[in-house]
């Protein structure tokens, strides 16, 4: 069998991935999982034609109205977030309703981090994520964010 010579694979270089765009996504009324998967796709750069898995070519995302995200079904009363304080018997559990009142940005961040690769590249891509309570994002005006409807 003869090898095809006209097939070419384009691989992006790190220098080509320097022009990063920023997007603003409103989480008000959105389902947590669907919102998180779209944000993770943008952070990784999978929405671009030139996507290359080993290059950090994702864009930045600003999520506003984090406290207005919702869950489907009975998860609102059943979902529990666990964390460890570092001390003996330091395992803590916080219900979704308490967490959304105390720290709404953690809920979205936890969901998105679970969808990202657990590598050095994944950790670097998560640094381009900003989650805000409320709809005021004027501190990121210099990035010229594009409002994105997900």
Curated annotation (Swiss-Prot):
Pfam families: Ribosomal_L13. GO terms for biological process: negative regulation of translation; translation. Keywords: Ribonucleoprotein, Ribosomal protein. CDD domains: Ribosomal_L13. GO terms for molecular function: mRNA binding; structural constituent of ribosome. GO terms for cellular component: cytosolic large ribosomal subunit. HAMAP family: Ribosomal_uL13 (MF_01366). This protein is one of the early assembly proteins of the 50S ribosomal subunit, although it is not seen to bind rRNA by itself. It is important during the early stages of 50S assembly. Part of the 50S ribosomal subunit. Belongs to the universal ribosomal protein uL13 family. This is Large ribosomal subunit protein uL13. It comes from Chlamydia abortus (strain DSM 27085 / S26/3) (Chlamydophila abortus). The gene is rplM.
């Amino acid at each position: 069998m003869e090898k095809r010579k006209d097939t070419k694979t384009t691989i992006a270089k790190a220098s080509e991935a320097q022009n990063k765009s920023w997007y603003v996504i409103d989480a008000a009324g959105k389902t947590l999982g669907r919102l998180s998967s779209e944000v993770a796709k943008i952070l990784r750069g999978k929405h671009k034609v030139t996507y290359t898995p080993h290059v950090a070519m994702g864009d930045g995302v600003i999520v506003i109205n984090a406290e207005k995200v919702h869950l489907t079904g009975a998860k609102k009363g059943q979902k529990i977030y666990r964390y460890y304080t570092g001390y003996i018997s330091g395992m803590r559990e916080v219900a979704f309703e308490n967490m959304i009142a105390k720290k709404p940005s953690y809920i979205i961040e936890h969901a998105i981090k679970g969808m990202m690769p657990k590598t050095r590249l994944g950790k670097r891509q998560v640094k381009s994520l900003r989650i805000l309570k409320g709809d005021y994002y004027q501190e990121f005006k210099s990035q010229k964010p594009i409002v994105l409807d997900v």
